[in-house]
Amino acid sequence: MKTFMDKDFLLYNETAKTLFYNYACKCPIFDYHCHLNPKEIAENKKFKNITEIWLYGDHYKWRMMRANGIDEKFITGDASDYDKFIAWVKTVPNLIGNPLYHWSHLELQRYFDIHEVINEDNADTIWEKANQKLQNMTVKDILKKFKVHTIGTTDDPTDNLEYHKLINEGKAQIGKIYTKVVPSFRPDKAINIEMPDFSDYIKKLENASKINIKDINSLTEALYNRIDYFKSLGCVSSDCSLSIVPFNLDDEKNIDAIFKKAMNKESLNFEDIEKYKTYILIKLIKKYKESNLVMQIHISAMRNNNEVMFKKLGADTGYDSVGDSNIIEKLSFLLKTANNDGGLPKIIFYSLNHKDYYPLSTLMGCFQEGSIKGKMQLGSAWWFCDNRDGMEEQIKILANTGSLALFVGMLTDSRSFLSYSRHEYFRRILCNIIGEWADKGEVPNDIKYLGSIIENICFNNSNIYFNN
């Protein structure tokens, strides 16, 4: 019988162990998409207790606490940090088979050298040991420990990026660090014309860009202005979230009329919304191509399903789910149209619905180019798919339909500084898959060859992809 989560956790063959210990675990981390707060990095934040670093803002854990009958007071309410910690510890034993069960134990092991099984009997021991370690742990210590080479934060076009500037000039409180912290351009609020605060947001964009946004052309100009600003501060990537993929072409005059209706807070129908989004996305794709920015597209998240709780707590609090729309046909038209209008940038496609992996992977193969290796990427298993089964499925589908060796690998997509252990989780799974292939004679048992593929997926590919 194997020991629970020992050093060979998830490594079920000797080749996998060799690949992990000699190659994967030595690689730096290129975390090209996350939701870390750059202010906390700049200020070299020190966390007051394990609840703050483990549970604050982590809606993955919040969902499971609710499912386990924990009152909201102990999740997002005014209970003490200790009581919230106890509520989470009571939840964990019921999560067997859930990735949070593995992640939570891995976080305790790697950050705090705590190897106890999480349960109520061990709660006070874990609380005391972790808090003792946190007295001498800052963000800078975490980034150094996990060899974090690059952090790509997620930023609104109106952000002034003051903390990115301070960090990369070595003038922030954190001082000079090995880690590069770069902004990513996420214009969702300028795309989502149907939102009630759209016109207010455009005024904010107007102030940030110092461009009078009076029509669709000046809106495009303002967005391009902010892309240039982001680029000047090291931005290498954009991102957008699409619950459904729009495609409905119309002439610029009609798009301008739709935009002006929205600015006057007039109601828009679905056709108006789709036409506007199609137009703006094509304009952004063109600019990303010209600016050599990677475009990340996150598709099929159905957000804020529970209106009662959305009104109480706002977005990103655990009330999103997997969407189930047919994305491929319209995505094909969108890519085809943008490609005809100057070409496509490098694009990473993510879907929250795993049924889209085969269609996405084969569609992106239609837009690969000989000049750039792996120009189009099937993104790592995301959010609800970000578990062992989901990672294995994404890796194998990519291998079956494309070039796994060119994959840009894992990202945290997280708000927590404890999430770097997820890179280890992914790396173990990757090494186990390739090791199993080697042990079965399906690929050459050439450790140097396989090791180079592991190193490339874990770090080298992303470093080249985002920096060339």
Swiss-Prot record:
InterPro entries: Metal_Hydrolase, Uronate_isomerase. This is Uronate isomerase. One of its GO terms (biological process) is D-glucuronate catabolic process. Its EC number is 5.3.1.12. Keywords: Isomerase. SUPFAM superfamilies: Metallo-dependent hydrolases. Belongs to the metallo-dependent hydrolases superfamily. Uronate isomerase family. Pathway: Carbohydrate metabolism; pentose and glucuronate interconversion. It catalyses: D-glucuronate = D-fructuronate; aldehydo-D-galacturonate = keto-D-tagaturonate. GO terms for molecular function: glucuronate isomerase activity. It holds the Pfam family UxaC. PANTHER family: URONATE ISOMERASE.
